[in-house]
Amino acid sequence: MERYRVGGAVRDRLLGRPVDEVDWVVVGATPEAMEAAGYRPVGKDFPVFLHPQTGEEHALARTERKTAVGYHGFEFYAAPEVTLEQDLARRDLTINAMAEDAGGRLIDPFGGQVDLQARQLRHVTDAFAEDPVRILRLARFAARFADDGFVVADETMALCQRMVAAGEVDALVPERVWQELARGLMEPTPRRMIEVLRQAGALARLLPEVDALFGVPQSPAHHPEGDAGTHTLMALDAAAAVDASLEARFAVLLHDVGKALTPAEALPRHPGHEEAGVDGARRVSERLKAPRACRDLAVLVTRWHMHAHRALELRPGTVVELFEGLDLFRRPERLEPFLHACLADDRGRGGREASDWPAGDFLRAAFEACRGVSARSFVEQGLRGPEVGEAVREARCRAVAQVPRPDAGAARDGA
């Protein structure tokens, strides 16, 4: 029985990155032998065990065989005679198909180290085409390693395009798409995930509402960066730069889907794109089976983001309407993710990548002022039922009116 470190631990060590977790492949063992040695079985689809002391995952070397369309259509074979090279051959990218033995000797049958040095994301074998999830994983790794200069190898992109044309991504279940999309959105350069998916043709199949934004013109005065798709990509990276939550990043991805619905005669302005985009944001969220918090914030940011950008010009009653629309008085934890998404939207424009956004500070202060209003005092005055609600709202409006407002600066009307 021989153990080998594999995959991300080997790759990240060679890149000089921190190694967060170590996975192992075991050659020449059986499940019975692993359990006899104290390993705890945890794998459902194939033999995976946890080390009795370290808790690190140890998988028996295995091969895979395609049996049907989609990522579920695989048959696995794990046995003592399966070699390390056979196990590595089933992996997606060459940089993930390296191993080290117990002495630290590198085992690299597919040129992963060369591709690391050349900053290439390249498939190991044409078996890559058997699993459409690998297109999503490729895009996710492109987002992770973009700052290191990694690019997708031409032949790998061509293979992905053929997979999409063959309908492979159409067989992906929503939960798997969401899992990879969510992980990609949390990478340092999430725009690269969307760019790779778009180049492969997969974005149009998985997120047609986002794909439709590319080529949609915007007002040059507000969006010198170009079309609505480019703005969305820039906003995603701006969200990553402020360490926004997954909920906020997903909301940024969808916040402008209404711009693809703007009538041609209105272009390049997009009046009413917030309301127009609500159904699209809700549809994407439900199709992907995104978590409720992600779904809710995506819809709310889509609907209300222009109110946030115009906050310094809004009447106090409209500011309170914004807070009510976000349901902040019952869900105050929504404020920061909402503001992060709107900040990213503001910075996702040419020349504003590091700009201040005074509207955010004003909205925080205004909401705190509103929270200082208590219904109890009005009840003690003898008000009842709807009278209490009306009095509370009026008091909140007065509180907002007392909050100092910095200079509004350049408006974003219709942006």
From Swiss-Prot:
Name of this chain's protein: Multifunctional CCA protein
PANTHER family the UniProt entry points to: MULTIFUNCTIONAL CCA PROTEIN
UniProt domain HD: residue ranges: 228-329
Taxonomic classification: Bacteria, Pseudomonadati, Pseudomonadota, Gammaproteobacteria, Chromatiales
Enzyme Commission number, as recorded: 2.7.7.72, 3.1.3.-, 3.1.4.-
Residue sites binding CTP per the record: 8, 11, 91, 137, 140
SUPFAM superfamilies the record matches: Nucleotidyltransferase, Poly A polymerase C-terminal region-like
GO biological process, one term: RNA repair
NCBIfam families: PRK10885.1
Entry-linked Pfam families: HD, PolyA_pol, PolyA_pol_RNAbd
Free-text function comment from the UniProt entry: Catalyzes the addition and repair of the essential 3'-terminal CCA sequence in tRNAs without using a nucleic acid template. Adds these three nucleotides in the order of C, C, and A to the tRNA nucleotide-73, using CTP and ATP as substrates and producing inorganic pyrophosphate. tRNA 3'-terminal CCA addition is required both for tRNA processing and repair. Also involved in tRNA surveillance by mediating tandem CCA addition to generate a CCACCA at the 3' terminus of unstable tRNAs. While stable tRNAs receive only 3'-terminal CCA, unstable tRNAs are marked with CCACCA and rapidly degraded.
MF term (GO), any: phosphatase activity
The entry's keywords: ATP-binding, Hydrolase, Magnesium, Metal-binding, Multifunctional enzyme, Nickel, Nucleotide-binding, Nucleotidyltransferase, RNA repair, RNA-binding, Transferase, tRNA processing
Gene: cca
Cofactor dependency: Mg(2+); Ni(2+)
Catalytic activity: a tRNA precursor + 2 CTP + ATP = a tRNA with a 3' CCA end + 3 diphosphate; a tRNA with a 3' CCA end + 2 CTP + ATP = a tRNA with a 3' CCACCA end + 3 diphosphate
HAMAP family: CCA_bact_type1 (MF_01261), CCA_bact_type2 (MF_01262)
Binding annotation for ATP: 8, 11, 91, 137, 140
Entry's cofactor comment: Magnesium is required for nucleotidyltransferase activity.
Domain notes: Comprises two domains: an N-terminal domain containing the nucleotidyltransferase activity and a C-terminal HD domain associated with both phosphodiesterase and phosphatase activities.
Note: A single active site specifically recognizes both ATP and CTP and is responsible for their addition.
Subunit structure and binding partners: Monomer. Can also form homodimers and oligomers.
Homology family: Belongs to the tRNA nucleotidyltransferase/poly(A) polymerase family. Bacterial CCA-adding enzyme type 1 subfamily.
Annotated binding of Mg(2+), by residue: 21, 23
Cross-referenced InterPro entries: CCA_bact, HD_domain, NT_sf, PolA_pol_head_dom, PolyA_RNA-bd, tRNA_CCA-adding_enzyme
